[in-house]
Amino acid sequence: MAMKLNALMTLQCPKRNMFTRIAPPQAGRVRSKVSMASTLHASPLVFDKLKAGRPEVDELFNSLEGWARDNILVHLKSVENSWQPQDYLPDPTSDAFEDQVKEMRERAKDIPDEYFVVLVGDMITEEALPTYMSMLNRCDGIKDDTGAQPTSWATWTRAWTAEENRHGDLLNKYLYLSGRVDMRMIEKTIQYLIGSGMDTKTENCPYMGFIYTSFQERATFISHANTAKLAQHYGDKNLAQVCGNIASDEKRHATAYTKIVEKLAEIDPDTTVIAFSDMMRKKIQMPAHAMYDGSDDMLFKHFTAVAQQIGVYSAWDYCDIIDFLVDKWNVAKMTGLSGEGRKAQEYVCSLAAKIRRVEEKVQGKEKKAVLPVAFSWIFNRQIII
């Protein structure tokens, strides 16, 4: 971990076939996707630089109102031009409704349990939307003080939330009609997750907040895109379209958030790279890390292990996202940085390669132990991870 790499070096992640199982972590040692990110901590200077409540933060984001209107709000779709969940579900007003449900269940019956565990986990993550909206509304400079402010930042947050709301609605209804999952246990998990809240470690700082959302939206895009490919592989073209449309939304949202940080890096590269480094040192906390169904205290780790196992999202994707953001924000080419900024620059530019080396060593040394895990979402049927 102490080894330094050239800041301009970008390593490509080894490609993984999503239809081939990735070696899972050793039994009893299931790892979070981000567990190897860093053991270092940000210095006090970082927190001085990013201290919440600075008047300059409000001034900066107020000055970017017009820019956000012209460059960020364009990534939203009007309600009239948006797909809705009912577009992909059986029509309850039709005489053919029962036949449509039967056809849907017929397509779903041969899809493996592993896939449904991941699809349920993705849906539960989407359903905790109130938590994510509240995170953005706590950030200085962009918060929606009244709940209906007309600023570009507040407008974006509300409209983004409205678009995202369709994702959980559609997946929830699909899973309900599929007959493959225990909806009551899923509903309990959703209630537990929303009730537990989430600390993203963004400290109400918009720099950190937008770095977090840039990372998360791209991760979610990757996850839904891969569930779409798997659904196609299993022969359910309708489900593939469902997941594909959700992935398309996530990619569009990721583009907007990434563009915001790109603008911040142009205006204030020092603060931006320090914020980026700070978030990566603290490790990006996945939105559903507090997932709980009333019995499995390690539910999130078990869910993510299955996601990695079937090729939906893994440590390799985490590394690819870091490299993507480093490149998109031109981190390696930043100049005029403070001493703290240069340290942050060096850290983030070499991080993905370090994680890959550690992960390759871990996977190379781990015994191929198996762990049968019962998931309440699929009526306590066991999956080997």
Swiss-Prot record:
Record's cofactor remark: Binds 2 Fe(2+) ions per subunit.
One annotated GO biological process: fatty acid biosynthetic process
Tissue expression profile of the protein: Found only in tissues which synthesize petroselinic acid, such as developing seeds.
Listed Pfam families: FA_desaturase_2 (PF03405)
Binding site for Fe cation 2: 164, 217, 250, 253
Source organism, top-level taxon: Eukaryota
Main location as per UniProt: plastid
Reactions it catalyzes: hexadecanoyl-[ACP] + 2 reduced [2Fe-2S]-[ferredoxin] + O2 + 2 H(+) = (4Z)-hexadecenoyl-[ACP] + 2 oxidized [2Fe-2S]-[ferredoxin] + 2 H2O
EC number, UniProt record: 1.14.19.11
Binding site for Fe cation 1: 126, 164, 167, 250
Compartments, record wording: Plastid, Chloroplast; Plastid
One Gene Ontology CC term in the entry: chloroplast stroma
Annotated organelle transit peptide span: 1-36
Any one GO MF annotation of this record: stearoyl-[ACP] desaturase activity
Function of the protein: Converts palmitoyl-ACP to (4Z)-hexadec-4-enoyl-ACP by introduction of a cis double bond between carbons 4 and 5 of the acyl chain.
Family listed: Belongs to the fatty acid desaturase type 2 family.
Protein name: Palmitoyl-[acyl-carrier-protein] 4-desaturase, chloroplastic
